[in-house]
Swiss-Prot record:
GO cellular component terms, semicolon-separated: cytoplasm
Compartment(s): Cytoplasm
Listed NCBIfam families: PRK13285.1-1 (NF009793), PRK13285.2-1 (NF009798)
Physiological role: Acts as an anti-CsrA protein, binds CsrA and prevents it from repressing translation of its target genes, one of which is flagellin. Binds to flagellin and participates in the assembly of the flagellum.
Primary localization: cytoplasm
InterPro entries with a match to the protein in the record: Flagellar_assembly_factor_FliW, Flagellar_assmbl_FliW_dom_sf
Keyword Cytoplasm among record annotations: yes
Biological process per Gene Ontology, one example term: regulation of translation
Protein name: Flagellar assembly factor FliW
Source species, domain of life: Bacteria
Length: 159
């Protein structure tokens, strides 16, 4: 299927990779079909959640577990049922990223992850019932904090 996109130009996508969001994504409820696109490097934690029906709409997304090492939550039963999840191995979790002009202020939404069942290509954004996570978690700040922690661990080993 040929798709005209804002970020990638005209691309050919495999229709079997289209993810159906039954209720859309909050704020974009009428747009229900998306595909996950890689921006060159498949090892990068960043991806694009590209809408199939509106080539202008794409969300920058990130694998939150690659950024926040202790990110942990239970998928709500309603989402498990709605998405037909049978195994955690069939689940992809993404966080929507906001990239402002000042890239050092880039944030990710840990409070409302996008959950995708990769087995049946159903997805939804789920709002977690916890105060532990924020809708604006600073990515660069988190990565710097991890570097400091890793560095501190290295110093301990040398002593």
């Amino acid at each position: 299927m040929l798709l005209k996109t804002k970020h990638f130009g005209e691309i050919n996508i495999d229709e079997s990779k289209i993810i159906e969001f039954k209720d859309g994504i909050p704020g974009f409820e009428n747009l229900k079909r998306y595909v996950v696109l890689y921006d060159g490097d498949k090892n990068s934690p960043f991806r694009w959640l590209q809408n199939v029906d509106d080539g202008e709409l794409a969300f920058a997304v990130v694998n939150p577990f690659m950024v926040v090492k202790d990110y942990d939550f239970e998928i709500p039963d309603e989402a498990v049922e709605s998405l037909g999840i049978e195994s955690i191995l069939d689940v992809m979790v993404l966080s929507i990223v906001v990239v402002p002009e000042d890239i050092s202020k880039m944030t990710m939404n840990l409070k409302a992850p996008v959950i995708i069942n990769t087995k049946n290509n159903k997805g939804m954004q789920v709002v977690l019932d916890t105060d532990r996570y924020s809708v604006r978690h600073y990515i660069i700040e988190e990565l710097r904090r991890q570097e400091v922690n890793v560095g501190a661990g290295s110093d301990e080993k040398e002593k």
